[in-house]
Amino acid sequence: MGSWRLLFSDSRGVVYDHPELLAAVRSGDEQLAPRERPTSLPAGARLAMLPGRRPVGIDPDSGAPVVLGEVKVGRKRFVPNAVAATLPPGWTRTLLPASARHPLAFGGDDAPILPQWAYTAAALGADGPVAFAMHTDRRGHWSVETHSTEDLPERVAERLASSDNPIWTQLSRCALEWSCFTAQNTFYLRDEGAIPASSGCNARCIGCLSEQQEGMPPSSHERIRQPPTAEEMGEVAAEHLANARGRVMVSFGQGCEGEPTTRWREIAKAIRIARERTASGSIHVNTNGSLPRALGALFDAGLDACRISMNSASPDLYDAYYRPIGYGLADVVRSMRVAKEKGGYLSLNLLTFPGVTDREEEAERLCRLVADVGVDQVQTRSLAIDPDVYMDVARERGGAGRPIGIRKLVAELKRARPGLVIGNFSRAMKERASR
């Protein structure tokens, strides 16, 4: 049992450490003492209060979990809230924050559903706050220090003044209001630039970033209202591919939209427009993989890479989270095969959740899929969702068995597919040869 101290906060979000209790962590539904070492809180990470959640610590004498009740700090008495870390790009959560729902503090029948963040277990170590996470992509071009810079508003204003293309209006909101790094790159003219393409979707994901049902927390993004034309998309794509510096690519399929391949005809035309103007850079799509024929048509038009998202290789758990309309997991796997048949670079956007994704049978199914299809890269994406909401979906679904841990899951994936790239960011054309 480690010596990391329990963190808790008051109602204003001021964080304290407990003088006696040690930190507990969560894996699935289980709250326990951590069995792995944490890392110092990464640059760009933050500590966040979990409203309506009591902190859960470990009694250092008995080793048993303890729900923290009313505390006294100085002259102040209050009911504490649990604390979690939120991580910067390039990091993957390995454990969840331990907590207990506490409805009484809100005068209602239930605690509020938490906003959409990838809540990570945190504690206090000897040298400061720590988080239970692993550094899965060390490339520095997605650093928080190089985004949301002081000159960004001016860059956005200049672009909006010079073009009436409505894509720039959407990207300006993404860049400034929601701090989307991919959208910001389009204004910085570097690396991966964003091209939102679709306002509609053929899935109803429980953790959708751009459209949530009534009673859920507000979406972290607002979906593009008017789907852009092929000409509008082609214009933005061509300019970025021709003029950007660094690891240059454009990607269709962003957090501010639905499923891009539902507009595959327009995107295919946009790709051809861009390629008529420049041969530079990479053209990429982020997709749920629901439409294999549509994806194949995009590769025929000039697409060279895709990232297909999934939370599980188990059909029942996949369906329960994505709530697909008119397709299933078998179609997603077919899309993966299409990408490889067309010579594309295939990334799997794996939505990870400690205690579910790393269950023994879940891990085995994922490893078989990655090896069988020939996935080039797995991007480990910590699922941004209230942990209790996801467990309601996953508790009785998916593969069984004890969790092996996110770190071991990553190691097993690499063993199953020699040469597999593990990371968090899409690879540009020049980065793919060294698979």
Model region roles, listed by residue range:
Residues 323-325, 335-362:
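Conserved strand-turn element in the central/C-terminal portion of the radical SAM core barrel
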Residues 255-257, 288-290, 311-313, 351-353, ...:
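Active-site beta-loop-alpha junctions enriched in small/polar residues
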